[in-house]
């Protein structure tokens, strides 16, 4: 998973400068992205299916979600059906679901896009 994490992190950073794995620091500037691998299923050989969550976070002064929606659309345009490769693996991402999330802090706006990533190991 280390190689997949590194590959995805670099790719998301090419889309948006503030990208974090699992948890953003409390000092993170909005808007930002947080990604995680929530489930990994292996066939026992060189194929794995990975559920990848990409969460967009924003705290707009006026509550308007346009910037967040634009960010998430940009992420999806770049990631959906995209194949990334590095030494030892190739992975293709497919959008599965889009979920608007409510945060305990009513000023924060969130969107979660869940991707099914199909990962192939290479010998």
Features from the language model and the residues they span:
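Charged, amphipathic alpha-helical segments and their flanking helix caps
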Residues: 1-20, 36-123
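A short beta-turn/loop motif at secondary-structure boundaries
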Residues: 24-28, 105
């Amino acid at each position: 998973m280390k190689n997949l994490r590194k590959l995805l992190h670099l790719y998301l950073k090419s889309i948006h400068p503030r990208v974090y794995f699992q948890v953003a620091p409390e000092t993170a500037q909005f808007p930002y992205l947080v990604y995680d691998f929530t489930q990994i299923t292996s066939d026992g050989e060189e194929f794995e299916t990975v559920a990848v969550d990409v969460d967009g976070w924003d705290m707009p002064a006026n509550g308007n979600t346009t910037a967040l929606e634009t960010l998430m659309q940009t992420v999806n345009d770049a990631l959906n059906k995209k194949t990334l490769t590095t030494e030892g693996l190739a992975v293709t991402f497919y959008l599965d679901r889009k979920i608007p999330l409510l945060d305990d802090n009513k000023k924060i706006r969130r969107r979660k896009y869940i991707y099914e990533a199909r990962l192939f190991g290479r010998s």
